[in-house]
């Protein structure tokens, strides 16, 4: 059956910003879907608010709208573009919920838009807990005993009836948001109250707990004619009770008997048939390990996180096939692009083991509750492939980049036996390491199984690793022992640590012994058919399947798992680098381990290696590929930059900016000397290797000071301290300082922060744009609202920034990208830091300027000059030009009629016990973009897209630190003048009344009921403005207020600058005033 002819133009809804529970997998799925639809001759319109995605590039869809994903904005896009079809199942829960809202509001009917793919009735039956349960009963599929509740009282009544523990699952939410496991009445009331608030239909499912049962998933695909296949079975190592996004997952399932597999596979196919799914779908089961009994947990009637994993694990392009099914094609008509010969109706076969391990943000949020449950907490994930379970497991562990290359964990090793057993009993992010430690201490596999409910098969695999640790420690390192250790997944570094050798010495010995990895192919058919676009994984087996054709080739290092501080923005640059190398006639070879990303899609590069980003693993690929031009490190974030020096020392050429120049930018002493030579000021500071040295530096330069370890990224453990007592407390509590781990102490200037991204060839520098941060220095740049072009800088300040940026880029001989951050204090411009690599603002500037930074940087790295590429300040209409004897720098032309605002997005609701106050340490997980003719409208769009919905009337709570009171008075007066009611804590209320601003006093927690948290819970406060007093103790009023507000969906602003931005919007836009839309194609 050919594709349907009644549809020529299709609207695809993206998934918006990255939050916990919805990460890069939807950029990968959406990008693949847009390409698939255009292959079928359709015009594609896309709406997505996330500028960091490949999906929102101008060439991916015919019309790209980076606008808030709300019913009003999607309707405006539909009214303008008049698509005949809407594809909602590739934008995660956001896309699905939006389709439901548009249908219910009559928008789709009004504009004659047909829903493509899985019908709305099927979506509703899968997502609505009551309808789903009724359908399962109808087709004879077992579901746990449960109740649909719309009030906490109904949930408590069910709890009384069936007993605890019970699992709470809110309807239509993402990543288990608002859900949890209730062990008693108190927990039930808390979880259900929150869950009902977060469910768009105010509905929760409360079900009997199946804790301890195995969790098994099937990724299935069905077309409109009823043909269906299973693509992959997946088994969660963690039993039921831990969200699948937080579980270690193995594919294919390892512990099922053939009979169990056939029963569950048949059930999955029966369920999607009964639902009438058209496209990809994920079915989750609980399987009783002690009897042949199973329960259906839930169905995701859309492409999901598990789809991305199944897709990368099998080589089957799920999103592409789902998009083609949505426009009427059948499975037996869709060619599998991986093999080029088989069709999509062919079920994948796997002859290897795939493991996914989640990446958690607990290194950033040390106070967060690390217990894992039904509400997801991971920010990203890694995937590893090997022939054996232990081999894939250890490969995945070292892909996580948590400083551990094996199953040794100092914090776990320090636990006493009782605490270790508790760690085994309670699911948490360190349980894998606890299992290994328990085995080392002689705890048996049956005992660990009884405590953790982890299947003995997996425990035996971990036991094999522990046994090899012992064998390596006890005996000589023979060639036979080396080979067995490598087959179990041990890295050279892990072997070296056990036997007391340097990792490179282990490598040399291993190569002398002839113990080398081979590379195997992922091709979706276990080698039955030749693959047209293969990708590879390493293992210590016999036959090498990798083919490395001669010719020019270069390696692009990816950025690994998504985590706070290193997100999808870096994958964006790596993808553009791979594409541009191809265009230059250079074979692009990508190494990465993140299954969610576009960089690990089968057709992004010429060859893909799914490997950890460590020196050993990268060198193995370089050796396999033979004569390469070099490795590009500057697009993979800090992950790739950290490999530049070790690779260079190992004799591998690092392409782009010279290693020594990168060190000049990173090394404190050399960087200070560079700035001194160039006469460019920076805030005074120094390096300390002891507490007393830090105190001496602070006394010399004056308080407040910004202190941070010199060896971390993403602002980790960075803090502003205001006096000596705070400094001593920080040095004592936050970090271990020593001669090889110095602390940087800088004078903190409370000024405006500005940053630039530049591309340089060593002779010419293009400053792509100057971005102004709305929050003052002291809030991490990734957590600030950024505005382009600048709105408050003077012409002289802009000239100075262009001059400084040019001189720095030329002095460092930058070849490719460089990001420079400045602070303006007392009219003077100071350099804060220089990063000679791609930055998280590259996708944002690429979208709004039209200058494809990563592409141009790759052309420069490939050997072109900017002049050869046609970039010239005189011909390009440069906004500002600065010339020196060494070369010229110029500011890319700025739009006269547009302002762009990038706003951060946080995942506070998923992480309990985390302070929401902004600081020098980055906390946001994603970003959105608002673009319009002026700042208030662009800001409005960005705030709306980021989830900050401030009502045009209501009550504002002011509770601010003493040092902020004077400044807060002006803001409070503006809110009051706009008609808001002001309430404040005692000190702030007194200050407001002294300024004749009407304000009512409210109680702090310690002052008795009703206190501020009670008012928030009762819905009597609409906006909280709260700045940080000293200290972040979880028992302090400020912390409790901020957490209560976040958990009850009340917008909370912890920076007066953000509050000022909100006021700009409120005072400029009338309630209900319509704001226009524009497509990326119209911007430049």
From Swiss-Prot:
Binding site for Mn(2+) 4: 833, 835
PROSITE patterns reported in the protein's UniProt record: ATP_GRASP (PS50975), CPSASE_1 (PS00866), CPSASE_2 (PS00867), MGS (PS51855)
SMART domains, per the entry: CPSase_L_D3 (SM01096), MGS (SM00851)
Amino acids binding Mn(2+) 2: 298, 300
Cofactor needs: Mg(2+); Mn(2+)
Database matches in InterPro entries: ATP-grasp, ATP_grasp_subdomain_1, CarbamoylP_synth_lsu, CarbamoylP_synth_lsu_oligo, CarbamoylP_synth_lsu_oligo_sf, CbamoylP_synth_lsu-like_ATP-bd, CbamoylP_synth_lsu_CPSase_dom, MGS-like_dom
Domain MGS-like: 948-1084
Superkingdom assignment: Bacteria
Function comment: Large subunit of the glutamine-dependent carbamoyl phosphate synthetase (CPSase). CPSase catalyzes the formation of carbamoyl phosphate from the ammonia moiety of glutamine, carbonate, and phosphate donated by ATP, constituting the first step of 2 biosynthetic pathways, one leading to arginine and/or urea and the other to pyrimidine nucleotides.
Name the UniProt record assigns to this protein: Carbamoyl phosphate synthase large chain
Taxonomic lineage from the root: Bacteria, Bacillati, Bacillota, Clostridia, Eubacteriales
Recorded name of the encoding gene: carB
């Amino acid at each position: 059956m050919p594709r349907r002819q009644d549809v020529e133009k299709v609207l695809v809804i993206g998934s918006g910003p990255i939050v916990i529970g919805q990460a890069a997998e939807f950029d990968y799925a959406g990008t693949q879907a847009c390409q698939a639809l255009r292959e079928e001759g359709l015009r594609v319109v896309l709406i997505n608010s996330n500028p960091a995605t490949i999906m929102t590039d101008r060439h991916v869809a015919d019309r790209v709208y980076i606008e808030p994903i709300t019913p009003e904005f999607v309707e405006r896009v539909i009214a303008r573009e008049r698509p005949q079809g809407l594809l909602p199942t590739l934008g995660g829960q956001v896309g699905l919920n939006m389709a439901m809202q548009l249908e219910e509001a009559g928008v789709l009917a009004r504009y004659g838009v047909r829903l493509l793919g899985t019908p709305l009735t099927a979506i509703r039956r899968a997502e609505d807990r009551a309808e789903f349960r009724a359908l399962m009963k109808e087709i004879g599929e077992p579901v746990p005993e449960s109740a649909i509740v719309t009030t906490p009282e109904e949930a408590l009544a069910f709890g009384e009836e069936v007993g605890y523990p019970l699992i709470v699952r809110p309807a239509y939410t993402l990543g288990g948001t608002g859900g949890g496991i209730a062990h008693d009445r108190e927990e039930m009331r808390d979880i259900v109250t929150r869950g009902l608030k977060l469910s768009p239909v105010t509905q929760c499912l409360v079900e009997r707990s199946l804790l301890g049962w195995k969790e098994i998933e099937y990724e299935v695909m069905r077309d409109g004619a009823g043909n269906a296949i299973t693509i992959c079975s997946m088994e969660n190592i963690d039993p039921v009770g831990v969200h699948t996004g937080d579980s270690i997952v193995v594919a294919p399932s390892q512990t099922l008997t053939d009979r169990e597999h056939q029963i569950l596979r048949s059930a999955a196919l029966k369920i999607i048939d009964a639902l009438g799914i058209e496209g990809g779908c994920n079915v989750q089961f609980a399987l009783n390990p002690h009897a042949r009994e199973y329960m259906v947990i839930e169905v995701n009637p859309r492409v999901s996180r598990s789809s991305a994993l199944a897709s990368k694990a099998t080589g089957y392009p799920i999103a592409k096939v789902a998009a083609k099914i949505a426009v009427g094609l059948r499975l037996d008509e869709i060619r599998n692009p991986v093999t080029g010969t088989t069709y999509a109706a062919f079920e994948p076969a796997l002859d290897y083991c795939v493991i996914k391990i989640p990446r958690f943000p607990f290194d950033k949020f040390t106070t967060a509750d690390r217990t894992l449950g039904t509400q997801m907490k991971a920010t990203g994930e890694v995937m590893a492939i090997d022939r054996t379970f232990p081999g894939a497991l250890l490969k995945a562990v070292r892909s996580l980049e948590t400083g551990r290359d094996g199953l040794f964990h100092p914090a776990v090793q320090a636990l006493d036996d009782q605490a270790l057993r508790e760690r085994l009993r309670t699911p948490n992010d360190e349980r894998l390491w606890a299992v290994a430690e328990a085995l080392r201490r002689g705890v048996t596999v049956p005992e660990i199984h009884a405590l953790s409910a982890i299947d003995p098969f997996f425990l035996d695999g971990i036991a094999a690793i522990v046994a090899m640790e012992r064998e390596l420690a006890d005996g000589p390192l023979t060639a036979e022992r080396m080979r067995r250790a490598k087959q179990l997944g041990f890295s050279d570094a892990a072997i070296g640590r056990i036997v007391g050798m340097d990792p490179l010495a282990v490598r040399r010995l291993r190569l002398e012994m002839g113990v080398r990895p081979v590379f195997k192919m992922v091709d979706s058919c276990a080698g039955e058919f030749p693959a047209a676009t293969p990708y590879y994984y390493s293992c210590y087996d016999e036959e090498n399947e990798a083919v490395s054709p001669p010719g020019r080739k270069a390696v692009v290092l990816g950025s690994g798992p998504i985590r706070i501080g290193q997100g999808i923005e870096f994958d964006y640059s790596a993808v553009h680098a791979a594409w541009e190398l191809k265009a230059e006639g250079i074979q692009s070879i990508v190494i990465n381990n993140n299954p969610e990303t576009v960089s690990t899609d089968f057709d992004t590069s010429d060859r893909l290696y799914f490997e950890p980003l460590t020196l050993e693993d990268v060198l193995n690929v370089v050796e396999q590929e033979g004569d390469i031009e070099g490795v590009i490190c500057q697009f993979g974030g800090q992950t790739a930059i950290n490999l530049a020096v070790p690779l260079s020392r190992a004799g591998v050429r690092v392409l782009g900016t010279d290693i020594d120049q990168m060190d000049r930018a990173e090394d404190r002493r050399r960087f200070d000397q560079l700035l001194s030579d160039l006469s460019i000021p920076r805030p005074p500071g120094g390096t300390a290797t002891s507490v007393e040295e830090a105190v001496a530096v602070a006394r010399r330069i004056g308080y407040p000071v910004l202190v941070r370890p010199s060896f971390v990224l993403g602002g980790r453990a960075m803090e502003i301290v205001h006096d000596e007592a705070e400094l001593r407390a920080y040095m004592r509590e936050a970090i271990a300082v020593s001669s090889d781990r110095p602390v940087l102490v800088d004078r903190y200037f409370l000024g405006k922060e500005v940053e630039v991204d530049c591309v340089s060839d060593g002779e010419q520098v293009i400053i792509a744009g100057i971005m102004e941060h709305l929050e003052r220095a002291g809030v991490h740049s990734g957590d600030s609202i950024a505005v382009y072009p600048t709105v408050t800088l003077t012409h002289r300040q802009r000239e100075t920034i262009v001059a400084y940026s040019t001189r720095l880029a030329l002095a460092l001989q930058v070849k490719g990208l460089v990001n420079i951050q400045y602070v303006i204090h007392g009219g003077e411009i100071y350099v804060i830091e220089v990063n000679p690599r791609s930055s998280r603002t590259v996708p944002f500037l690429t979208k709004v300027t039209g200058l494809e930074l990563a592409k141009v940087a790759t052309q420069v790295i490939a050997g072109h000059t900017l002049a050869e590429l046609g970039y010239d300040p005189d011909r390009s209409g440069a906004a500002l030009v600065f010339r020196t004897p060494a070369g010229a720098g110029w500011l890319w032309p700025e739009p006269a009629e547009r302002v762009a605002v990038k706003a951060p997005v946080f995942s506070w609701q998923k992480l309990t016990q985390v302070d929401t106050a902004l600081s020098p340490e980055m906390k946001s997980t994603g970003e959105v973009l608002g673009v319009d003719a002026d700042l208030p409208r662009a800001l409005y769009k960005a705030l709306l897209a980021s989830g900050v919905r401030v009502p045009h009337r209501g009550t504002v709570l002011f509770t601010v630190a003493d040092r902020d009171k004077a400044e807060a008075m002006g803001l409070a007066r503006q809110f009051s003048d706009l008609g808001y009611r002001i309430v404040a804590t005692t000190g702030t209320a007194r200050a407001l009344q002294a300024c004749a601003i009407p304000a009512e006093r409210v109680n702090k927690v310690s002052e008795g009921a009703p206190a501020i948290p009670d008012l928030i819970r009762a819905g009597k406060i609409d906006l909280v403005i709260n700045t940080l007093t000293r200290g972040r103790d979880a028992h302090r009023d400020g912390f409790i207020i901020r957490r209560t507000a976040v958990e009850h969906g009340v917008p909370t602003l912890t920076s007066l600058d953000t509050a000022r931005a909100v006021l700009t919007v409120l005072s400029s836009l009338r309630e209900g005033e319509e704001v226009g839309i524009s497509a990326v194609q119209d911007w430049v």
